[in-house]
Amino acid sequence: GIFSNMYXRTPAGYFRGPXGYXXN
């Protein structure tokens, strides 16, 4: 989603946030 575009997606399909990984 929005955060995926901001932080880039990981192979797992989650987004990388400033505090780590979170579900998308």
Curated annotation (Swiss-Prot):
This protein's UniProt keywords: Antibiotic, Antimicrobial, Cell wall, Fungicide, Plant defense, Secreted
Q: Where in the cell is it found?
A: Secreted, Cell wall
Name one process (GO BP) from the record: killing of cells of another organism
Disulphide linkage map? none
One CC-aspect GO term? extracellular region
Tissues of expression: Distributed in the epidermal cell layer of leaves and in the subepidermal layer region of stems. Not in roots.
Query: What does this gene product do?
Result: Antimicrobial peptide. Active against Fusarium spp., Gram-positive and Gram-negative bacterial pathogens.
Family assignment from sequence similarity: Belongs to the DEFL family. Group IV subfamily.
Q: What is this protein called?
A: Defensin D6
Organism of this sequence: Spinacia oleracea
Biological classification of the source: Eukaryota, Viridiplantae, Streptophyta, Embryophyta, Tracheophyta
